[in-house]
Structures are given as structure tokens and as C-alpha cells.
Amino acid sequence: MKRHRIVAAAVLTLGAAAASAGDDAQLRAADPAELSYTYAVGAFAPEYTPPAPGSYTLPPIDTVTDHALLGADGRPTTLFALTQGRLAVVAFVYTTCIEATGCPLSLAVLHRLDRAIAADAELARRVVLVTISFDPERDTPARMAVMRSFHAPASDWRFATTRDEAELQPLLADFDQPVAKLRFADGAWSGLFRHVLKVFLLDGESRVRNVYSVGLLDATLVLTDLRTLLLASRRSPG
């Protein structure tokens, strides 16, 4: 297995109120809209050079269905309404995540992708980034709007959440995205989640074409995959 060097840091300053993971009440009260976010935007630097776009194929892995969402503007929407038949990079996060190689890393890589996509006319027209919260209890549309404002997207980068767990769970199951609340011995929720970092690449037919975990989540690789799918679509326009 090839090693990767972490050259990106993602630091979420929670402040004294959330410094102790043992204080459930304080963790629950932590509000990202009032906290100081500091992201050193970067990515993993893999010890290999990705192959040239179009020199390989990305066979479909799975297909996802449409799901109800709430946009950062508070309006009801759906996954497919956001993607609109375009290539999509979809990531699941929660705004109070403090694991550097978790949600902050995902957001940092999507931030780099956003800038690169905006600088390429074809990518800007045919690619959408979608960040969805798996913490509907705290990550309201207003909170997702704060996150969007922080990143100030240059391309079409959408931020969304769900109304409740009833809408969230089928969405997570469809993507095979494991998420579980971390609880104290007495069963009380710590305010944190155990989750596996996954970022999904969807084609225009909502088929999963790649899944990036910590060891593969590199903006250069994702961009190469996007260009590979665009080249393939030109060869097979139907």
C-alpha cells in the first residue's frame, strides 16, 4: 500500500466551552456560527502521479436515488435538484466535527476543488459540489449557510441538510455512509459522531463512479477522475 503524507491541516477552534469532550451539555451547546473556524486549506499529497485523464475507466459502482434535502437557504430541495444531471462530488459532514482527518479534511479538499473547477470553463459548467450534513438536529439551514459563507464558493458548491433523522437515514443508507452518535456510558449523546470519511463521485445518471476515503482524498485525483468522465461522455454522447 502506498503511503501518503498529510500536508493539510484542518483545525476547528471550539473554545473553552467545548474543550472537554466529557461535558455533554457544553458539547451540545457548541454553535459553529459563533465559533472561530481556521482551515489550512490543502490536501493529501500522494506519493504517486495520477494517470492521464482518459487513460483509464471508472466503471459504475452503485446507483443512488433521489432524496429530500433542505438547502442552505431553508428551501426544500432534493439531491437530484441540486445535481441536475451533472457530475457531482458529494460529501457528508457535520459542522462541529473536530477530527482533523474527518469533516475538516473533506471540506478543505472540496475548497480546493471549488477553486480549480471555477478556473476551468467546462468543469464549471458540468460539475457540482454537494456538502450534506448528517446532524440535522444542530446543522440547520442557517448553520449550513454560515459554512457556505465561510468557504465563499467560486463554483456551484451547494450546502444542504435534512429536516430530521427520518429523512437522513435513508440517504445515508443509499450512499452506504456509516454514521453513529458517540454516547457516554449512561447513554447520553456526547455531541460527537463516529463516522467514516467518504467522498462520492457521481456521474450524470447518479451512478457512483468512485469513493474517496482518507488515503485517496486528493483534489488532483478527483479532478483527474472528473476529466476522465467528461472525456468518456464525449466518446459516448448517448
Predicted regions located by residue number:
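Sec/Tat-exported extracytoplasmic proteins
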Residues: 62, 86, 93-96, 101, ...
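Periplasmic c-type cytochrome electron-transfer domains
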Residues: 24-46, 142, 157-169, 194-199, ...
